[in-house]
Amino acid sequence: MQSRFTFLATRTLKSTTTKAKNRTFSSSTVESSTKQPPQFSQTLAGLRARLAVESPTLSDFIHLQSNNTYSVEVGTKKKPLPKPKWMREAIPGGEKYVQIKKKLRELKLHTVCEEAKCPNLGECWSGGETGTATATIMILGDTCTRGCRFCNVKTSRTPPPPDPNEPTNVAEAIASWGLDYVVITSVDRDDLADQGSGHFAETVHKLKTLKPNMLIEALVPDFRGDRGCVEKVAKSGLDVFAHNIETVEELQSSVRDHRANFKQSLDVLMMAKEYAPPGTLTKTSIMLGCGEAPEQVVKTMEKVRAAGVDVMTFGQYMRPSKRHMPVSEYITPDAFEKYKTLGMEMGFRYVASGPMVRSSYKAGEFYIKSMIESDRSVSSQLPIS
């Protein structure tokens, strides 16, 4: 696995060094247009050295902290402070929202939008600025075998067995909506021999058979790091393989279930890159406001990028209920924007970063859709060797 990591890191850095070497985001540095840019080695250390010269640095985030513009306090348990204005959610509504909710009830489908109390539910289901409604479908039931401290999905050691007809029913239901891009996710199913990977792969395959041109993002669990499970899903016909690391490396044990960890999640994303057909994107997401420090976020971004991940999203952690892990702070839009700038300079193909952004946020889906279509258009014009 170490050799695979080295290969991905080298390939990633080679593909991004050229396009970024002439750009700078340091407000205190003005480089002459005639000065030759420094050369950096094609390693993780080289990536860090280049970013120190060309991108927002930790001092930028520390400056935000010292000016009280990095985050806003949440108050105490007895005296909580009101949410900042940028965290106020819109009330769900609209004709499309009502139609989708009714359709989901008729088909007995579960969505992570509802189960996880996503703050963007109203925007995504009503169509938002794009006018196209989207929903993230959750398969393998509505009960998870794990108990992460941030998640609102109900848990059980022995959830009901999966519905064998679900792959067909879900595929037919989604195909009937006429969507261009859909996200399919699932709960963890540690109780199943294959962690639910076969059920997941079957759902994707059947949907792709019905709608060959539909772009499918699969937001999958870690399958306990099982290579065979990852391979099965990666080869199922999906367009985007997504798996969330959820938080920085240092907070994994206090935020996620004890069966999940940072290395295992990175391994899953690297395996997906290995097994999926060329052109398949990999994607991950982390929450901010869990108690992480800026330097931990930057270090996590470096490792994720060196693992070959194409897309990364950042959003504000929101406590689903008083039973869940408390929010440590509300990160400001300015700080989120700096993480986005840094991520693009690192070489991620797309970064969605904002207080209300979630891993399957609709604005990101449309951008990824256009990116995939552009890649395929270019690929189709290349001569066959």
Swiss-Prot record:
Full protein name: Lipoyl synthase, mitochondrial
Residues given in the record as [4Fe-4S] cluster 2 binding sites: C144, C148, C151
SMART domains, per database record: Elp3 (SM00729)
EC category name: transferase
GO MF entries: 4 iron, 4 sulfur cluster binding; lipoate synthase activity; metal ion binding
UniProt-listed Enzyme Commission number(s): 2.8.1.8
Residue segments, region Disordered: 18-40
Record note on cofactor: Binds 2 [4Fe-4S] clusters per subunit. One cluster is coordinated with 3 cysteines and an exchangeable S-adenosyl-L-methionine.
Stated family: Belongs to the radical SAM superfamily. Lipoyl synthase family.
Binding site for [4Fe-4S] cluster 1: C113, C118, C124, S360
Species annotation: Populus trichocarpa
Gene name linked to the record: LIP1
Other remarks on this protein: This protein may be expected to contain an N-terminal transit peptide but none has been predicted.
Keywords assigned: 4Fe-4S, Iron, Iron-sulfur, Metal-binding, Mitochondrion, S-adenosyl-L-methionine, Transferase
Any Gene Ontology biological process: lipoate biosynthetic process
